[in-house]
């Protein structure tokens, strides 16, 4: 009785399989719940990003013609293209020359080209944003932690006059230990 036929095709009846597999398992009682987020809804992430940069006192440090590296990572961010557009608009209004640098460690096969492909997966392209994507796996040593560990920065971002980090902040899935 595992095999069924419909419209001339034979297939496994998954209901019977699940019933047999799960019949000896006792599940705890479940309660239907609904979670309602109390945080305000951002109607336009693009406008919110523009407003945040446009009203930030530090944007005044950007002088006409200076380069501004905007980071874009491999962690999914809702409407990341809109957010980047808002930041790009604010930087351009200040006279800055924005560009995108991938910020994702070994994702994309740890190659500059692979990281550009990861950004493309999220809709982050030169065509969509009207700015260059400058990708490199090269880094420069910018200092050391208090414990003596070296701190590296993307060499292209380091060469920019300014850097605006944009991305999702979350601990690495393999990180263990106190922060």
PLM segments and residue spans:
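Short, Lys/Arg-enriched N-terminal segments with co-localized hydrophobic residues
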Residues: 1-11
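Short glycine/serine/threonine-rich phosphate/pyrophosphate-binding segments
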Residues: 77-84, 109, 172-175
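Short glycine-rich or small-residue beta-strand-to-loop segments that form or flank ligand, phosphate
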Residues: 67-77, 99-106
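Histidine-anchored nucleotide/phosphate-binding helix
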Residues: 78-97
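Glycine-rich phosphate/diphosphate-binding loops that line cofactor/substrate pockets in enzymes
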Residues: 53-69, 92
